[in-house]
UniProtKB/Swiss-Prot annotation:
It holds the Pfam family Spy1. GO terms for molecular function: protein kinase binding. The lineage of its organism: Eukaryota, Metazoa, Chordata, Craniata, Vertebrata. Residues 1-90 are annotated as: Disordered. This is Speedy protein E18. It comes from the Eukaryota. Residues 76-90 have a biased composition (Acidic residues).
Length: 352
């Protein structure tokens, strides 16, 4: 019994201490009475706030720091900007390159990522005043167009020159064997029947007849050189009725330049063209004779005529656009137009 009494006494002392500790302090009661008298109560928050609170800073969100706010602002600005579309990488596709029987060969081909909108963006960045409506017409193109218009106006004022078209090439069937056909590329000749008629008309000229009769060794006028004369007539671009004696000798002289290495035989063309023959001019290499010949007015006239012939030869060469070479196939085609013509009998192989 004594033990239980002592336990109750101790418990009563402890409860008394607790009640005294819970009783409000008189100073605290006064502060509470003042706060309730006329001012609103303030709520006390036990959460810790990092850093000193400056005036003007809202301490309401305690967990949001200044760095977090800046990151949020930057993220908002980045969201407001339009997202840039990345250009797609060029793709590759497989296309059919060759089909042989039942087998098909594929070839890998690169697909270009350039789109029409890229051309529009490029034209929009041009200088002000440039019309971007045609995407392929740039400022440089306009300048070229102006220069071209000026050149066309100047060409209209000058007489137009008719140039001979360049020869084309076609594919013709050479051989047919069973189900296989062999193709051969063949050159289309520009020689027309009117060119043959102009050549035959010039053969009736007395000076040309005399020249062909004099060349018995065929060193200047064999069948291939004469066929080149017809080819040059077709390339010069003149009408058939305009070809005269001078054109025949110009073409023959140019053909000798292209095919022959000996320069002496073709010099006889000058003497037949200007009314002289080679036999009438003595081959004397005496200096006194050469000096007297230089002082002769007739010799001066001959030199001026030869210089004029060389000038005309160069003009005739330019009228053909420099195409003085003639293939063997084209010469055979020219001769095949009239194979019974007496000119084609002038063959050097028969003389030997």
């Amino acid at each position: 019994m004594d033990r239980t009494k002592t336990r109750f006494r101790k418990r009563g002392q402890i409860t008394g201490k607790i009640t005294t500790s819970r009783q409000p302090h008189p100073q605290n009661e006064q502060s509470l009475q003042r706060s309730t008298s006329g001012y609103p109560l303030q709520e006390v928050v036990d959460d810790e706030v990092l850093g000193p609170s400056a005036p003007g800073v809202d301490p309401s969100p305690p967990c949001r720091s200044l760095g977090w706010k800046r990151k949020k602002e930057w993220s908002d600005e980045s969201e407001e900007e339009p997202e840039k579309e990345l250009a797609p990488e060029p793709e590759e596709t497989w296309v059919v390159e060759m089909l042989c029987g039942l087998k098909m060969k594929l070839k890998q081909q690169r697909v270009s990522p350039i789109l029409p909108e890229h051309h529009k963006d490029f034209n929009s960045q041009l200088a002000p005043g440039v019309d971007p409506s045609p995407p392929h017409r740039s400022f440089c193109w306009k300048r070229k167009r102006e220069w071209w218009d000026e050149s066309e106006e100047s060409l209209e004022e000058e007489p137009r020159k008719v140039l001979a078209p360049e020869p084309e090439e076609i594919w013709v069937a050479e051989m047919l064997c069973g189900l296989k056909m062999k193709l051969k590329r063949r050159r289309v000749s520009l020689v027309l029947p009117e060119h043959h008629e102009a050549f035959n008309r010039l053969l009736e000229d007395p000076v040309i007849k005399r020249f062909l009769a004099w060349d018995k060794d065929l060193r200047v006028s064999d069948k291939y050189l004469l066929a080149m004369v017809i080819a040059y007539f077709s390339r010069a671009g003149l009408p058939s009725w305009q070809y005269q004696r001078i054109h025949f000798f110009l073409a023959l002289y140019l053909a000798n330049d292209m095919e022959e290495d000996d320069e002496d035989p073709k010099q006889n063309i000058f003497y037949f063209l200007y009314g002289k023959t080679r036999s009438r001019i003595p081959l004397v290499r005496n200096r006194r004779f050469q000096l007297c010949r230089c002082l002769n007015p007739r010799a001066r006239k001959n030199r001026s005529q030869i210089a004029l012939f060389q000038k005309l030869r160069f003009q005739f060469f330019c009228s053909m656009s420099g195409r003085a070479w003639v293939s063997r196939e084209e010469l055979e085609e020219i001769q095949a137009y009239d194979p019974e013509h007496w000119v084609w009998a002038r063959d050097r192989a028969r003389l030997s």
